[in-house]
């Protein structure tokens, strides 16, 4: 097939994503709007929201929602949390906190904080994860932060954790994610 014949298909697919992404309301986190930047359904449907002027390949903060239809009960949620921990550890993450908590209504959720040391980029990536049961099944809400400092990024990341981790945890606890069935999905 000639390139000139494939270009319209690529253009069409790109415009379909832009149309779907543009119809999704931004997710607000700490009063800052995050717009849908990517979504896929590889293993589980996942939507990544970026702050203004950032992309999924070049971000300093990222808000991600993952649909987990495989978890529908509290024991399923515990297994999901263990799987999250195992996956992060397998990718070199250092688990800084893993705890079952209760929201203001008394509903339990799992809260996990994981750090990734990225010395080549002189940064520490921190993932704050809430795994909870929604109306139909579990979901994960992940707030990612990349802390960078050319002189001492590790010290800056520690200071960030000391100063901000409590408020990030509270913001995640109270965060209402969009109804997952309203978010775009790719048809295969």
Where are these regions (language model features)?
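Bacterial N-terminal signal peptides
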Residues: 8-16
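Secretory pathway targeting signatures of secreted, lumenal, and periplasmic proteins
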Residues: 32-72
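Mid-chain, structured segments of secreted extracytoplasmic proteins
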Residues: 62-104
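Surface-exposed amphipathic alpha-helical segments
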Residues: 139-188
């Amino acid at each position: 097939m000639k390139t000139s014949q494939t270009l319209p298909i690529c253009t069409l697919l790109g415009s379909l994503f832009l149309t779907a992404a543009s119809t999704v309301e931004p997710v607000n986190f700490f009063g800052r709007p995050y717009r849908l930047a990517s979504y896929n359904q590889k293993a589980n449907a996942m939507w990544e929201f970026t702050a203004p002027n950032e992309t999924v390949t070049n971000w300093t903060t990222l808000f991600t929602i993952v649909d987990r239809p495989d978890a529908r009960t509290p024991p399923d949620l515990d297994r999901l949390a263990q799987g999250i921990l195992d996956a992060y550890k397998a990718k070199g993450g250092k688990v800084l906190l893993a705890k079952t908590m209760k929201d203001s209504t008394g509903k339990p959720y799992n809260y996990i904080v994981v750090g990734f040391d990225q010395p080549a980029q002189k940064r520490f990536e921190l993932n704050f994860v809430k795994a909870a049961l929604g109306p139909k099944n579990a979901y994960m809400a992940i707030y990612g932060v990349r802390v960078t400092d050319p002189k001492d990024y590790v010290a800056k990341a520690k200071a960030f954790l000391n100063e901000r981790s409590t408020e990030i945890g509270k913001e995640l606890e109270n965060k209402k994610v969009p109804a997952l069935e309203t978010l775009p999905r790719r048809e295969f």
